[in-house]
Amino acid sequence: MVSNGPKYGGTCSRGNTLGIEKVSKRAPRTSVIVINWNGKHFLDTCLTALRRQTFKDFETILVDNGSSDGSQEHVRANFPEVRLLALGENLGFTGGNIAGWNEARGELIILLNNDTEVHPQWLESIHEAALAYPEAGGFACKMLMFDERTRIDNCGFDLGATGTSFDLGRGRADGPEWRSPREVFGACGGAAVYRRKMLEKVGFFDDDFFMTFEDVDLNFRAQLQGFKCMFVPGAIVYHHLRGTMRKHNARQTFFSQRNNEYFYLKNMPLALLVRFLPRRILYEVGAFAYFCLLGQARPFLAAKLDVLKNLGPLLRKRQRVQRERTLSAGELRRMMCADTLGNDLRRRWAKFRGALPATLRRRSRVTEGIS
């Protein structure tokens, strides 16, 4: 159920209420929050890379979401510098990060997936960018494929009119166009950097999301209040794509399709909701057909029903977001991806073809050649 909460994002309360370990008196300049749930096999690579950073003024907070694979014991025995926040249950990516944020002390708050390995100069590059772009409230890292390190996972994301977030550079070679800073709509939550002052103004993650699209929602709120996001090419992160999440399971489908509606209805200005309605309808029809092909029609429909059940609280959150918005609808429209409808339809068609049996994929290619 959607809760109103103290704001339209996650709680900003402070204090050591969750039994976190190893709290020093001096606050570090940066807090790195790593979420873990039964990911012990990733932790040596992730935490050792943090230990090797050239920039040293930071703390690592590992939030363990009630793991049963010995993750907590492994961290205590092998990484004594890590502040371990052991939760008694799985609060999801969203709830785990909110717990970490409530204990973080740095002026820069960095979220990092446990299935990553960061370059030794990762933090140094982030701090150089923070000094170079004081007007930016957030920063996106260059995420490369873990097993193919010259190919991009993402360099932040842009937003389309239908509510689709497009991972910038996904699957492309790491060429010259990805070696210069640029403004992007937002940072992927797998390696995202936020200024504390921005989070204290716009709120952190919305704890109703649990997982997926919480990063899009946060970046959307930040943009609406005038906080830009910069891509930092030197902040290199190697990422096991979906290393900690299975693709196309019912739970993932439910949260992704519910939360897509949550962030879209909560943040999109009314003028653009009306303007983009035909595109949004086409998007929903295409999404439903796609999930039917995957045998995921039930969780898809359950997600949409859940949105309707919680529409009242969601609209109250929307009122707060729109009341504090400083960005005009026209300015937001100019920030969005060009040719969004065409991009969405091509993306859906590519997914359809990938989900079809091989014989039908061959037929679709023949049909394309004839038309």
Over which residues does each language-model region extend?
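A short, conserved alpha-helix in the catalytic core of glycosyltransferases
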Residues: 185-236
